[in-house]
Amino acid sequence: MKYIKRILKIVGLVIILSLALAKLNIIFIRKSDVKPWDMINKIAGYFNEDKPYDVIFFGTSHAYCSFDTEDLAESGVTSYILASQKQPLEATYYYIKEAIKRSKPKAIYVDVLDALAMNEIDEGSVHTYTDYFPMGINKAMMIKDSLPPEEWAENVMPLIKYHTRWRSLEEKDYKAKW
């Protein structure tokens, strides 16, 4: 009985610590909410909704700068642009996997510029596609496949990167809900 109580206490502590770290990640993460690069609304917004879409666009900034969902809506086509700056194809693959769990689109469009441009990894751009992606196996695999090992920890747990932001926190940081 003592053994079971001890295990339950440890499991309870792990759950409490995990929830606290998850909330701290949300509070400390940089809030990229200035248009047109408002990744909070583009990425976290999609994963917090439960709406079906006919068409979903993926890829680099060329996708969100080139397609207009409002034009498609006028034709009766529901669409979403799930793209980010310099999003590598390795990340796009996991974006598609995660997106089709929530919506069964009739068409998927992938901007393949990254395959042609051979962009170098740029820390700011990396965080635009990793920070707001939901935690889970697809996020872990996306980070493993698209980034060098020395960058894995801060992208799985953004608090490692942003822990020094505590002096610049604003009210909106505490109200973030994704």
Language-model features, listed with the residues they occupy:
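Predominantly cytoplasmic-facing regulatory/coupling regions of multi-pass membrane proteins
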Residues: M1-Y3
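Hydrophobic membrane-insertion alpha-helices, especially the h-region
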Residues: K5-I26
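Short acidic/polar alpha-helix capping motifs at helix-coil junctions
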Residues: R6-I10, I29-D38, F58-H62
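Acidic/glycine-enriched edge-of-secondary-structure segments
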Residues: L24-S32, T78-Q85
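Alpha-helical transmembrane signal-anchor/signal-peptide segments
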Residues: I27-K51
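Membrane-embedded segments
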Residues: F58, H62-L147
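Secreted/periplasmic serine-hydrolase-like ester/acetyl group-modifying domain
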Residues: S125-W178
